[in-house]
């Protein structure tokens, strides 16, 4: 009987550790793409200190930093609304619109709102139940990958314009 109880306790502890580690991994991914130093430069670091003029700068056919940040904000805001069960604004489904709606005058607001939305997703994950996490883990992991991808693009654009400080993490 003691062995059975011992095995049940181990199984229970193992299941709890797996559930909490999924939350921990998702939070680590979200925070490393948002504002924590990890394997790569975070989004907050990638956009910090950039003027609205530099945010609107484009080289050839590439997107500007502002367009990339606006695109990230657009999709993260929709994910957060989904997670919270909120109604989303209508959207045509044309991904190009998520880049094209950036306006240089709104740069500082985009940066602030992006920080708030990313924090909102992190808070949602922190407070989510196991069932909520299970249902949304793939979406959250993909958001992190999406944000990391576009953060890399932001750094490439900043390097091209000469506004990137290599001391921030990428030479």
Located regions from the model:
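Short N-terminal segments immediately surrounding and downstream of signal-peptide cleavage
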Residues: 19-35
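Short glycine/proline- and charge-enriched loop/turn segments
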Residues: 24, 95-99
């Amino acid at each position: 009987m003691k062995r059975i109880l011992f095995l049940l306790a181990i199984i229970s502890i193992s299941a709890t550790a797996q559930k909490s580690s999924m939350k921990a991994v998702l939070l680590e991914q979200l925070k490393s793409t948002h504002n924590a130093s990890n394997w790569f430069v975070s989004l907050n670091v990638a956009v910090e200190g950039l003027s609205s003029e530099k945010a609107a700068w484009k080289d050839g056919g590439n997107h500007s930093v502002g367009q990339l940040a606006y695109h990230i904000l657009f999709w993260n805001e929709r994910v957060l609304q989904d997670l919270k069960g909120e109604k989303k604004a209508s959207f045509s489904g044309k991904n190009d619109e998520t880049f094209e709606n950036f306006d240089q005058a709104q740069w500082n607001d985009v940066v602030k709102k992006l920080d708030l939305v990313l924090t909102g997703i992190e808070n949602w994950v922190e407070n989510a139940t196991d069932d909520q996490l299970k249902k949304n883990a793939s979406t959250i992991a993909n958001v992190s990958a999406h944000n990391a991808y576009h953060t890399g693009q932001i750094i490439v654009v900043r390097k091209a314009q000469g506004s990137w400080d290599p001391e921030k993490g990428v030479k």
